[in-house]
Amino acid sequence: MYAVIKTGGKQYTVKEGDVLKIEMLPENVGNEIKFSEVLMLVDGDKVTCGAPFVAKATVKAEVLDHGRHKKVKIIKFRRRKHHMKQMGHRQYYSQVKITAIGK
């Protein structure tokens, strides 16, 4: 059984036991969270698609960790002007483990 969930403006294909890095959530480490925005649910040959979400379907997960991704460097450059600007960005994430998929 697996599901497609939506969180943080992105879609993830998940099954029980998966560990994901998703956009930062305002939850403490060790808390259990529920994702109610389930777009699709697949159980063997039975496929349930939502319009836009599957009714009464939830995915439960446990927050394992919070952290930051590797730095992404941004360079702005103006040709022939001796001008270059460098910036960096590190996005925050939450690491979660999928514990249950249910309807």
Curated annotation (Swiss-Prot):
Arranged from A to Z, the UniProt key words for this protein are: Ribonucleoprotein, Ribosomal protein, RNA-binding, rRNA-binding
Q: Which GO terms describe its cellular component?
A: cytoplasm; ribonucleoprotein complex; ribosome
One Gene Ontology biological process: translation
Protein origin, superkingdom? Bacteria
Q: Which Pfam families match?
A: Ribosomal_L21p
Where would one find the signal peptide in this protein? Answer: none
Q: Which GO terms describe its molecular function?
A: rRNA binding; structural constituent of ribosome
The similarity comment for this entry is: Belongs to the bacterial ribosomal protein bL21 family.
> How does the record describe its quaternary structure?
Part of the 50S ribosomal subunit. Contacts protein L20.
- Describe the task this protein carries out: This protein binds to 23S rRNA in the presence of protein L20.
Q: What is this protein called?
A: Large ribosomal subunit protein bL21
**Which organism is this entry from?**
Legionella pneumophila (strain Lens)
